[in-house]
């Protein structure tokens, strides 16, 4: 009974805020750009005096990939674009040692997750006590607790190897793409490809890669098994 009464009071309160223009319902959708910038639940806009309700947007897929001769790689994939502050926060709080953390960068008011990267080079854009955050195009790479790997670039794709796992990042804005982009990948090595490029995603499926996350941005091939945790 008390639970129903509290719920009723909450609904009346929310209706009151909406009726008086104090509740910004647009902030409730995950498509709102502001969601990638903060995990705070409630904020008040000082200019509009609207109450903005924000949902946490730091969901990550964590998987263990078995490959090669008894190798197991720990991989974290950001499901949604993250700000640089969130990358550092999640990298310290949730990403374990000896792991790879990849995803897309998004800074509100600075750059869109779909905007072309400012440089074709791989750059270190943030250094922390535990790891460096490297960027390629609009994607980020964190290699935590593992030896640095040599990186090679060609045809809008960055590739490197981490503890026996071959990893490639494909530019989200690269077009057109052809099958020869992926034909150059090692034919038998366990390969993880990360991309938000829809044409590349289709080519990966056609070339026998397996989707391994909810956003269909991470693909695996030549693995023994993988397990999402």
From Swiss-Prot:
Protein family membership: Belongs to the baculoviridae p25 family.
Annotated GO CC locations: host cell nucleus; membrane; viral envelope; virion membrane
Known role: Component of the polyhedra envelope.
Predominant subcellular localization, coarse grouping: virion
Protein name as annotated: Occlusion-derived virus envelope protein E25
Domain of life from the UniProt record: Viruses
InterPro entries: Baculo_ODV-E25 (IPR007938)
Keywords on record: Host nucleus, Membrane, Virion
Upper classification of the organism: Viruses, Viruses incertae sedis, Naldaviricetes, Lefavirales, Baculoviridae
Location within or outside the cell: Virion membrane; Host nucleus
Organism: Orgyia pseudotsugata multicapsid polyhedrosis virus (OpMNPV)
